[in-house]
Every structure is written in C-alpha cells, then in structure tokens.
UniProtKB/Swiss-Prot annotation:
The lineage of its organism: Eukaryota, Metazoa, Chordata, Craniata, Vertebrata. RNA-binding protein, which is essential for gametogenesis in both males and females. Plays a central role during spermatogenesis. Acts by binding to the 3'-UTR of mRNA, specifically recognizing GUU triplets, and thereby regulating the translation of key transcripts. The gene is Dazl. It comes from Mus musculus (Mouse). Residues 1-27 are annotated as: Disordered. Keywords: Cytoplasm, Developmental protein, Differentiation, Oogenesis, Phosphoprotein, RNA-binding, Spermatogenesis, Translation regulation. This is Deleted in azoospermia-like. It comes from the Eukaryota.
Length: 298
C-alpha cells in the first residue's frame, strides 16, 4: 500500500514538471511562447471555417469530459482558425498534443494553452496641444543702469512759417482763416535736442547764414493805388550823384523778400492780395468814369 501511494505523488510531480517544461520546448515543430500554462486546456489550431464548436466538442470527448470549447473570431464574427478546448478532469495534455489528429481531412495543430503574462501598460491620456505664442518683445527706452538716461522722442514741431501764414481777414470781427489756395515752400529748421535737467550735453550748432533784408515800403490802404512796382534802395550808391532807384517788379521783390526774410512773407503776400482787389476796384471805377465822360462828350 505504501509503495502504491508513493508512486502516485511521484507521477503527479513528474507530469507537472513535464507540463511546465513544455513552455521552453517545441510542440510539433513550433516554438511555444513564454507564459503560464493553463491546466487541462489544449490549444487547437488549423480549424476550418466550416467547423463549429459542437463538432469540436464531440471530437475531443474521447480524451475526457469537455468543459468548454472556444473558437476565436474577429470583430465581424469570422473564425480566425484557432481556439481552445478545456476539460473538467485531469487529462494528459502532452499525450493529446503528441497525437496526430486529422479532422475533416485537415491536420490540426495542437499544443498546450499558454496564457501570456500581462505586462503593465500605462494608459497615457493625450492632452490637448495648447500653443502659447511668445509675448511680444518689450522695448524699454530707459536703461537699467543707475545713471539712467531717458531718451524721449522730440514732439512734432509745426513749421513756424506755415504756422503763422494766415489769410488777411476781410472784417476785423471775422475769425482767422488759413490760406488753402496758395502752396508755399516749406522751410526746415533744426532744433537742438532736449536733455534732462541737471545734465550737460554738447552739440554742434550749424553756422549762421547772413540774411539780407530788402525793405519794401508799406502800402497805406487809404492812399491811391500805385503802379505795380516799388523801389528798392541799394546798400551803397552806384555813383556820386546820390542813391539811385531801381524799378523792380513787385511780384519778384515779394518772392526775394520772403526767401531771405520769412517774417515779411505774410505781410508782403497779404498786401499784394489786398492791393490786387483794391486795384481791381479802382481800375473799374476809373473805367466807369471814363465811359461817363465819353458819353457826356458825345
């Protein structure tokens, strides 16, 4: 009795050892994957698409009481050609694997059922890609040194010539109007840079130009209109007989005076306009008087 009981555990141990070692061996010429061998379960490959679970169950019932038949299919329900057959009782899986089984004229590929080890998989949830544009560069006009100097852009200066060029008001009570019908030349003036108080800066002043002023006699509004000429005195007499007068066209004299002395520009231009309108009225009056005299003579 003791001999028979000792032989039973030894046979069970040897069978388990042979089953565990099957993971490192080959089954019918195929290399088995590494993993945990499922007891009392057989891998069945080469299953025809015409086979169903009922036929496979009835076929493997000769080896023991079949517990479950599982055919692996894809998402559409089509068989992938392999499956698993599990038994209730302890069966010699190695014996079943080594046997040559033909079913419906097709050789089945048999082997131990091995469950692959579940590797730890980390499901990383994708995060939405957020694009943060870089902030715009900041330009500072003040340096970070202790003796910082503030560089300020000088304000836009209006040209002194165009600022004071205004139309001669027709009535003393009317507001000042800006001339828009005459295009005058623009004079550019360079102004010295403005530095903070308490600091000394040196800059170069352009050489001053000599200005020559040609004086033109003022026109009295109440006086008679003179011809369109005025006299300009020379700085030095041309001969010993005394200063001579040159007859110069007033329009030319006005341009020359405005070019060399911008302050007289407004005055001369305004007088010329006023003279023009008054001269026109006087000529019209004289012409009408001449017409009346001729009528009386006739």
């Amino acid at each position: 009795m003791s001999a028979t009981t000792s032989e039973a555990p030894n046979s069970a141990v040897s069978r388990e050892a042979s089953t565990q070692s099957s993971s490192a061996t080959t089954s019918q010429g195929y290399v088995l994957p590494e993993g945990k061998i499922m007891p009392n379960t057989v891998f069945v490959g080469g299953i025809d698409v015409r086979m169903d679970e009922t036929e496979i169950r009835s076929f493997f019932a000769r080896y023991g009481s079949v517990k479950e038949v599982k055919i692996i299919t894809d998402r559409t329900g089509v068989s992938k050609g392999y499956g698993f057959v599990s038994f209730y009782n302890d069966v010699d899986v190695q014996k079943i694997v080594e046997s040559q089984i033909n079913f419906h004229g097709k050789k089945l590929k048999l082997g131990p059922a091995i469950r692959k080890q579940n590797l730890c998989t980390y499901h990383v949830q994708p995060r939405p890609l957020i694009f943060n544009p870089p902030p715009p560069p900041q330009f500072q006009s003040v340096w970070s040194s202790p003796n910082a100097e503030t560089y300020m852009q000088p304000p836009t200066m209006m040209n002194p010539i165009t600022q004071y060029v205004q139309a001669y008001p027709p009535y003393p009570s009317s507001p000042v109007q800006v001339i828009t019908g005459y295009q005058l030349p623009v004079y550019n003036y360079q102004m010295p840079p403005q530095w903070p108080a308490g600091e000394q800066r040196s800059y170069v002043i352009p050489p001053a130009y000599t200005t020559v002023n040609y004086h033109c006699s003022e026109v009295d509004p109440g006086a008679d209109i003179l011809p369109n000429e005025c006299s300009v005195h020379d700085a030095a007499p041309a001969s010993g007989n005394g200063p001579q007068k040159k007859s110069v066209d007033r329009s030319i004299q006005t341009v020359v005076s405005c070019l060399f002395n911008p302050e007289n520009r407004l005055r001369n231009s305004l007088v010329t306009q006023d003279d023009y309108f008054k001269d026109k009225r006087v000529h019209h009056f004289r012409r009408s008087r001449a017409v009346l005299k001729s009528d009386h003579l006739c």
